[in-house]
Amino acid sequence: MIPTYMNIMLAFTISLLGMLTYRSHLMASLLCLEGMMMSLFIMTTLIALNTRSPLTNIMPIILLVFAACEAAVGLALLVSISNTYGLDYIHNLNLLQC
């Protein structure tokens, strides 16, 4: 396997392990999720460059749009929780409660 792909998969795995380790804090979870999205973006960009197919050129852009939307929603939740409770614990995020 090419070392570049191995490094990107290692970055994704480390971000996934960080997400599993720091799942109680929203800020750490969002940072790990961004690391996962960036490694997926780089991987899809490299695949699109290597295949040279016009159909795969749009995939990294779509992934980047979804990553930006995810970051905006995550930061909005973080600001809302920190203003309400003063902490960024995920267990404070109980939106189903009336």
UniProtKB/Swiss-Prot annotation:
As one GO molecular function, the record gives: NADH dehydrogenase (ubiquinone) activity
Identify the main location: mitochondrion
Which reaction is this enzyme known to catalyze? a ubiquinone + NADH + 5 H(+)(in) = a ubiquinol + NAD(+) + 4 H(+)(out)
Q: Might you name a Gene Ontology BP term for this protein?
A: ATP synthesis coupled electron transport
Classification from the root reads:
Eukaryota, Metazoa, Chordata, Craniata, Vertebrata
Q: Which family does it belong to?
A: Belongs to the complex I subunit 4L family.
> Species name for this entry?
Macaca ochreata subsp. brunnescens (Muna-buton macaque)
Keyword Membrane in the entry? The reply is: yes
**What Enzyme Commission number(s) does the record list for this chain?**
7.1.1.2
In terms of Pfam families, this protein maps to: Oxidored_q2 (PF00420)
Question: This chain belongs to which protein, by name?
Answer: NADH-ubiquinone oxidoreductase chain 4L
